[in-house]
């Protein structure tokens, strides 16, 4: 049996551009196919699947092969609870070197005073942020007030009273329907809502944008300990100078969740008051969205919170993932390049172009457009749900996700909108011409979806249909785009049998 690697090397013989990264990647797949065939096959099938779809889910992207290779190594075998040079385990000097380099690179990239690179996800980073704020702003003063040195000195009664006090403090954050994330505390099913009293703020019903005067009114009313700014489905930028002033007026901590737009900050697209770094007390982010890194999280903070955040173990974490930290370091170094800055600007240019073509063809976008990497289409006038649109678009090779909109009448599962993003398509090299073609394909599909008729002659609320001729045309146009902009072109799919 001829191995994948042998076939790849034979095909690559004499070709320019053959590099160690693609060879190493194929060697890893080759080994898995022979040793664990079902796993190897599923990985290859996923590569084929991703190469056959336009990835327009705003929270997804493509990491470089270098980033992926940095994750697949023996670093995964090392336990390293603690922080660099202060571990609970011995023999961590090599992990220390990698994590320290990752930290310093993050600080350089964002211009931050401190960086913590261990969180396994954005949700973990957010949980660490709120725990750090609770520790610094509520627990610490309470322990000192009672005349103790540490929380372990409290009696059971005092500890119970402290937990009740923590639960009475207010955290003000964006609601889910207004573009916030479930970890912002306004969804009671999430652990964040169980730690403090979480109060939501909404977008303005007319503009569908955040109203700073209304946020300021709520801050004066509730006097929150924490003000959260950030979003997972909001197509405009935020003014962090204004938000900092609002927070300072009541002594609140300004916590910014920039998971979606971290790459736009790193790439110099969001500058001055649109850059949260100079204004926020704590900033959390993922590393796998616009940053194009591995799945994981980061916490950037002012010096006030540096010590408590670096004590994430035992605060709310155990052992970090050193192999992922290595991959984060690679991604952050990639983000320091001129090419990444060009990429970040192109992401926003592509989103604006996409929005313009949607609007020209009569689709309604939340907020009337976009200033960042994403846009949300209101499907109400088309008479279909976000779930139906998501399913039908997926069937023709376009990956989007259904999304709630303000005052959503359909509900959180089926939704009235879809969210689209340009980070992944921009990584493939697509530009304004391709965005016009993508918009045209999507509009034609959406306008031709009809509701499936049930057995009782009523219409389904969750299933739609698309005429086969429209579907075939859309698939062909999608395939045409992807043939010109293949994912990981250095990996020859013909060898992946």
UniProtKB/Swiss-Prot annotation:
<feature type="site" description="Plays an important role in substrate specificity">
    <location>
        <position position="288"/>
    </location>
</feature>
<comment type="subunit">
    <text>Homodimer.</text>
</comment>
<keyword id="KW-0663">Pyridoxal phosphate</keyword>
<dbReference type="InterPro" id="IPR015422">
    <property type="entry name" value="PyrdxlP-dep_Trfase_small"/>
</dbReference>
<dbReference type="Pfam" id="PF00464">
    <property type="entry name" value="SHMT"/>
</dbReference>
<feature type="binding site">
    <location>
        <position position="176"/>
    </location>
    <ligand>
        <name>(6S)-5,6,7,8-tetrahydrofolate</name>
    </ligand>
</feature>
<comment type="function">
    <text>Catalyzes the reversible interconversion of serine and glycine with tetrahydrofolate (THF) serving as the one-carbon carrier. This reaction serves as the major source of one-carbon groups required for the biosynthesis of purines, thymidylate, methionine, and other important biomolecules. Also exhibits THF-independent aldolase activity toward beta-hydroxyamino acids, producing glycine and aldehydes, via a retro-aldol mechanism.</text>
</comment>
<feature type="binding site">
    <location>
        <begin position="180"/>
        <end position="182"/>
    </location>
    <ligand>
        <name>(6S)-5,6,7,8-tetrahydrofolate</name>
    </ligand>
</feature>
<keyword id="KW-0963">Cytoplasm</keyword>
<dbReference type="InterPro" id="IPR015421">
    <property type="entry name" value="PyrdxlP-dep_Trfase_major"/>
</dbReference>
<comment type="pathway">
    <text>Amino-acid biosynthesis; glycine biosynthesis; glycine from L-serine: step 1/1.</text>
</comment>
<protein>
    <recommendedName>
        <fullName>Serine hydroxymethyltransferase</fullName>
        <ecNumber>2.1.2.1</ecNumber>
    </recommendedName>
</protein>
<dbReference type="InterPro" id="IPR015424">
    <property type="entry name" value="PyrdxlP-dep_Trfase"/>
</dbReference>
<dbReference type="InterPro" id="IPR019798">
    <property type="entry name" value="Ser_HO-MeTrfase_PLP_BS"/>
</dbReference>
<dbReference type="GO" id="GO:0019264">
    <property type="term" value="P:glycine biosynthetic process from serine"/>
</dbReference>
<keyword id="KW-0554">One-carbon metabolism</keyword>
<comment type="similarity">
    <text>Belongs to the SHMT family.</text>
</comment>
<feature type="modified residue" description="N6-(pyridoxal phosphate)lysine">
    <location>
        <position position="289"/>
    </location>
</feature>
<dbReference type="GO" id="GO:0005829">
    <property type="term" value="C:cytosol"/>
</dbReference>
<keyword id="KW-0028">Amino-acid biosynthesis</keyword>
<comment type="pathway">
    <text>One-carbon metabolism; tetrahydrofolate interconversion.</text>
</comment>
<dbReference type="InterPro" id="IPR049943">
    <property type="entry name" value="Ser_HO-MeTrfase-like"/>
</dbReference>
<dbReference type="GO" id="GO:0035999">
    <property type="term" value="P:tetrahydrofolate interconversion"/>
</dbReference>
<dbReference type="InterPro" id="IPR001085">
    <property type="entry name" value="Ser_HO-MeTrfase"/>
</dbReference>
<dbReference type="GO" id="GO:0004372">
    <property type="term" value="F:glycine hydroxymethyltransferase activity"/>
</dbReference>
<dbReference type="GO" id="GO:0030170">
    <property type="term" value="F:pyridoxal phosphate binding"/>
</dbReference>
<keyword id="KW-0808">Transferase</keyword>
<dbReference type="InterPro" id="IPR039429">
    <property type="entry name" value="SHMT-like_dom"/>
</dbReference>
């Amino acid at each position: 049996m001829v191995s994948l690697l042998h076939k790849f090397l034979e095909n690559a013989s004499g070709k320019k551009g053959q590099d160690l990264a693609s060879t190493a990647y194929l060697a890893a797949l080759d080994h898995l196919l022979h040793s664990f065939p079902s796993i190897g096959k599923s990985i290859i099938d996923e590569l084929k699947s991703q190469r056959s779809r336009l990835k327009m889910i705003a929270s997804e992207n493509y990491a470089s092969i270098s980033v992926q290779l940095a994750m697949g190594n023996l670093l995964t075998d090392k336990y390293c609870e603690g922080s660099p040079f202060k571990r609970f385990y011995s023999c961590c000097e090599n992990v220390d070197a990698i994590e320290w380099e990752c930290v310093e690179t993050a600080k350089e990239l964002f211009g931050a005073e401190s960086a913590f690179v261990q969180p396994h996800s954005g949700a973990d980073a957010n949980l660490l942020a709120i725990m750090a704020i609770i520790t610094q702003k509520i627990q610490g003063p309470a322990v000192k007030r009672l005349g103790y040195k540490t929380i372990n000195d409290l009696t059971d009664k005092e500890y119970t009273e402290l937990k009740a006090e923590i639960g009475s403090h207010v955290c003000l954050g964006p609601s889910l329907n207004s573009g916030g994330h479930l970890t912002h505390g306004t969804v009671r099913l999430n652990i964040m809502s169980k730690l403090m009293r979480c109060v939501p703020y909404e977008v303005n019903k007319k503009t569908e944008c955040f109203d700073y005067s209304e946020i300021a009114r709520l801050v004066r009313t509730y006097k929150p300990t924490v003000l959260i700014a950030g979003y997972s489905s909001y197509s405009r930028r935020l003014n962090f100078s204004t938000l900092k002033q609002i927070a300072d007026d009541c002594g609140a901590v300004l916590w910014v969740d920039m998971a979606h737009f971290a790459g736009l900050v790193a790439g110099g697209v969001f500058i001055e008051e649109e850059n949260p770094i100079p204004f926020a007390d704590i900033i959390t982010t993922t590393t796998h969205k616009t940053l194009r890194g591995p799945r994981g999280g980061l916490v950037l903070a002012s010096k006030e919170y540096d010590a408590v955040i670096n004590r994430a173990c035992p605060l709310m974490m155990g052992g970090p993932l050193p192999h992922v930290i290595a991959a984060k370091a690679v991604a952050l170094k990639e983000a320091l390049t001129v090419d990444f800055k060009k990429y970040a600007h192109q992401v926003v240019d592509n989103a604006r172009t996409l929005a313009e073509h949607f609007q020209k063809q009569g689709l309604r976008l939340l907020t009337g457009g976009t200033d960042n990497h994403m846009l949300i289409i209101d499907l109400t006038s088309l008479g279909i749900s976000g779930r139906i649109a998501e399913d039908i678009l997926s069937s023709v090779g376009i990956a989007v996700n259904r999304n709630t909109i303000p005052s959503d009448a359909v509900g959180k599962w089926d939704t009235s909108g879809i969210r689209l993003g340009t980070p992944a398509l921009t990584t493939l090299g697509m530009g304004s011409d391709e965005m016009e073609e993508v918009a045209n394909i999507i509009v034609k599909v959406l306008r031709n979806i009809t509701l499936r008729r049930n057995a009782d002659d009523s219409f389904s609320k969750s299933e739609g249909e698309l005429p086969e001729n429209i579907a075939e045309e859309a698939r062909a146009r999608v395939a045409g785009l992807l043939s010109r902009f293949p994912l990981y072109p250095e990996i020859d799919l013909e060898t992946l049998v």
